[in-house]
Curated annotation (Swiss-Prot):
Top-level taxon of the source organism: Bacteria
Pfam families: Trehalase
Main enzyme class: hydrolase
Native organism taxonomy: Bacteria, Pseudomonadati, Pseudomonadota, Gammaproteobacteria, Lysobacterales
Any one GO molecular function term: alpha,alpha-trehalase activity
GO BP, one annotated term: cellular hyperosmotic response
Protein name per the record: Periplasmic trehalase
An annotated GO cellular component: periplasmic space
Gene3D superfamilies according to UniProt: 1.50.10.10
Species whose genome carries this gene: Xanthomonas axonopodis pv. citri (strain 306)
Catalytic activity from the UniProt record: alpha,alpha-trehalose + H2O = alpha-D-glucose + beta-D-glucose
SUPFAM superfamilies per UniProt: Six-hairpin glycosidases (SSF48208)
């Protein structure tokens, strides 16, 4: 498996990354004991060695895997990788190789005989006479999973505590989704479940050295937008500021993962998630340890790479994987020509949202280190200030908004996207920059159904005309932090009306919404529209409490010192 393909300027190790080493035959009994949150040394300089895991499906039974995915045996490429092998995958693959050329061989029957299917999450059994808030409260139990042990050869990773899945095809927990889900759990009074989800993420950090995209073997080679510090902040709002010190070891490991390799970079070089610019400042990008097709989207990726003639397929695969790590899979933000997926160059982009989240992580670490008894040798407040200065220098467009920066071509994007509001959400924007960004967003991205993701139509799901619950909340919360209450209310109420209209018609909440007046679910992407839906449920509850209707009673929020307050 190739791991060392890199763009010009990337500094790569010749060794296979530890999270992706193939360890055939190892079972989940070799996991760290569920429920144990190991106390890592403070200011751990390197990421801990990850726990051994079974190989991903594309490595465990490669020939069978490719036959199923290439043959489009299932409409959704993710479906097969979630199947449970009923015996040793190597034996299944050997039997496939011995039988597949025989006359009358039936691939579907072979799969059915050797795998157990994982059904989608069902949420349609809820009463049809419920109001929106009650419906969400009834949804939570249907979205809860408890998997502190999984069968051998499963692609699922065990977690010590119950957790909430998004719904539909998403039968596992997802990193950045979960923050917005946890907001709703707290509003619903499900504070124990919210705490358990936080502890699961701390466990993942302790076990694998980072929080993977989701709790599947095929997600271990990457992470997702780093919201762990926001989860800790949310829990501090429930329990008090001692929470910051409790999760300090995991916050430090999370930071070490995202910053790994930064100390050794020369100007103009990149390694993993970090890039050192010509002026010496360090900013981050999205990345994936592997440069092969994603198992859960194998055919999509191979077809995309086949369209590219001017660079290696491995480079395309890594950029597709990095795009998946971004959460925005996919969007014009990552496309060189702004339209075609084959021009994807995610690893060349320094995203404004990612760097805002890491600023919040640095501020949270500074706050945790200030707690009585904490011992920290790094000045995280200074690191946050350095990042803020780098963002202002490289990610601020003087036309009046924050944008992404291409570190290879040294060009700042002129595209206005919903990500421009992340610096407000993280509390790093100056008052002037916040005001100008709000004005630009109002003119460019405001739609009848809320905040548009971008103003570009590409057919990708993270572009016009779709609206996503997490981006609505980032916008509303960020704008309110800077006194832009009117625009925040407009965005929040418009999106809430869209959610309510679709709910009134179909009695469900969905993953994404079209923002025109017909109150439809969103389109585009590699799979059908999903309902459930974790982060929409959470954001809807937050908006209902901010902008209550006739049957909604808003409870006053408990105030906690936030890590960005010292930086304003």
């Amino acid at each position: 498996m190739p791991y060392a393909t890199a763009r010009s300027g990337d500094v790569m190790s010749s060794a296979a990354p530890p999270c992706c080493t193939s360890l055939l035959g190892l079972s989940l009994s070799m996991f760290v004991a569920p429920g144990t949150l190991t106390a890592a040394p403070l200011d751990a300089p390197v990421v801990n060695a990850p726990a051994p895991t079974p190989p991903t499906p594309d490595l465990a039974y490669p020939e069978l895997f490719q036959a199923v995915q290439r043959g489009e045996l299932f409409d959704d490429q993710k479906h097969f990788v979630d199947f449970l092998p009923l015996r040793d995958p190597a034996l299944i693959n050997a039997d496939y190789l011995a039988q597949h050329d025989h006359p009358g061989f039936d691939l579907r029957k072979f799969v059915d005989a050797n795998f157990e299917e994982s059904p989608p999450v069902q949420t349609d059994a809820i009463r049809q006479d419920t109001a929106l808030r009650e419906h969400i409260d009834l949804l939570w139990p249907k979205l809860v999973r408890s998997q502190n042990h999984v069968p051998p050869h499963s692609s699922l990773l065990a977690l010590p505590h119950p957790y909430v899945v998004p719904g539909g095809r998403f039968r596992e927990v997802y990193y950045w989704d979960s923050y917005f889900t946890m907001l709703g759990l707290v509003k619903s009074g499900e504070t124990t479940l919210s705490r358990q989800m936080l502890d699961n993420f701390a466990y993942l950090i302790d076990t694998y050295g980072h929080i993977p995209n989701g709790n599947r073997t095929y997600y271990l080679s990457r992470s997702q937008p780093p919201f762990f510090s926001y989860m800790v902040e949310l829990q501090a709002g429930v329990e008090g500021e001692a929470v910051y010190q409790r999760y300090l070891p995991q916050l430090q490991k999370e930071y070490a993962y995202w910053m790994q390799g930064s100390d050794d970079l020369q100007p103009g070089q990149a390694a993993r998630h970090v890039v050192r610019l010509a002026d010496g400042s360090v900013l981050n990008r999205y990345w994936d340890e592997r440069d092969t097709p994603r198992p859960e989207a194998w055919l999509h990726d191979t077809r995309t790479a086949a369209e590219v003639t001017d660079r290696p397929a491995a480079e395309v695969y890594r950029d597709l994987r990095a795009g998946a790590e971004s959460g925005w899979d996919y969007t014009s933000r990552w496309l060189a020509d702004g339209q075609n997926l084959r021009t994807i160059r995610t690893t060349a982009i320094l995203p404004i949202d990612l760097n805002s989240l890491l600023y919040h992580l640095e501020r949270t670490l500074a706050l945790a280190c200030a707690q009585p008894g904490a011992e920290c040798t790094r000045d995280y407040a200074a690191l946050a200030q350095q990042r803020k200065q780098a963002i202002d220098a490289h990610l601020w467009n003087t036309a009046g908004y924050y944008a992404d920066y291409d570190w290879q071509t040294r060009t700042l994007s002129n595209q206005v996207t919903a990500a421009a509001l992340y610096p407000l959400f993280a509390g790093l924007a100056s008052d002037d920059h916040a005001k100008r960004t709000a004005s630009t967003v109002r003119k460019t991205l405001l739609r009848p159904g809320g905040l548009a993701t971008t103003a570009v139509k590409t057919g990708q799901q993270w572009d016009e005309p779709n609206g996503w619950a997490p981006l609505q909340w980032v916008a509303v919360d960020g704008l309110r932090r800077y006194g832009e209450d009117a625009l925040a209310r407009t965005i929040g109420e418009r999106f809430l009306a869209q959610v309510q209209a679709l709910f009134a018609r179909e009695h469900k909440l969905v993953e994404k919404y079209g923002l025109e007046t017909d109150a439809a679910g969103g389109g585009g992407g590699e799979y059908a529209l999903q309902d459930g839906f974790g982060w929409t449920n959470g954001v809807t509850l937050m908006l209902l409490n901010l902008y209550p209707g006739k049957d909604t009673k808003a409870a006053p929020a408990k105030r906690v010192r936030k890590p960005e307050a010292a930086a304003r």
